Amino acid sequence: MAEKVEEYRGCVIPKDLYYDIENQVWFKVNEDGTVTVGVTDIGQARAGKIINIRIKPPGKYVKKGKPVASLESGKWAGPVPADIEGEVVERNEKLFDKPDLINEDPYGEGWIAKLKPANLERDLQDLVTGEEAVQKLKEYIEREDVNCGEERAQISKKFYK
């Protein structure tokens, strides 16, 4: 059976997600038609410990490419763009008290928001998934010289068992 997740330089790369490579944002299409948004392992490693987050509230419509959230760490602050346009239907309230869940579990407890997509088929065409995503993320890791840390990677991989 093929692995659902790869690891490279300690960075966990789930193959079943869709990715915005340059912004290091992931998207998961859920069975109910919503899309979960989060920051990749690579993105959290580059940002450092997340200390503050702002997330658009439920009911807010987010245009393609506009921020669904913004993050702040000791060394970085920036947007989390929504490559999938739609209405925010839920946000991860846990992050307001514990924003570093993004660092600890970027693909699980550290998810940021859920969107009801306006045009999912169109928007997915601009993202990468599967082996193509793994290859492009490995290239990004090399280019930006990212190391996510082996010990933490083992914890994150358990999420996919």
From Swiss-Prot:
Its cofactor is (R)-lipoate. Binds 1 lipoyl cofactor covalently. CDD domains: GCS_H. The modification N6-lipoyllysine is found at residue 75. Residues 34-116 form the Lipoyl-binding domain. GO terms for cellular component: cytosol; glycine cleavage complex. InterPro entries: 2-oxoA_DH_lipoyl-BS, Biotin_lipoyl, GCV_H, GCV_H/Fam206, Single_hybrid_motif. The keyword Repeat does not apply. One of its GO terms (biological process) is glycine decarboxylation via glycine cleavage system. It comes from the Bacteria. The keyword GTP-binding does not apply. Keywords: Lipoyl. The glycine cleavage system catalyzes the degradation of glycine. The H protein shuttles the methylamine group of glycine from the P protein to the T protein. The glycine cleavage system is composed of four proteins: P, T, L and H. Belongs to the GcvH family. PANTHER family: GLYCINE CLEAVAGE SYSTEM H PROTEIN, GLYCINE CLEAVAGE SYSTEM H PROTEIN-RELATED. This is Glycine cleavage system H protein 2.
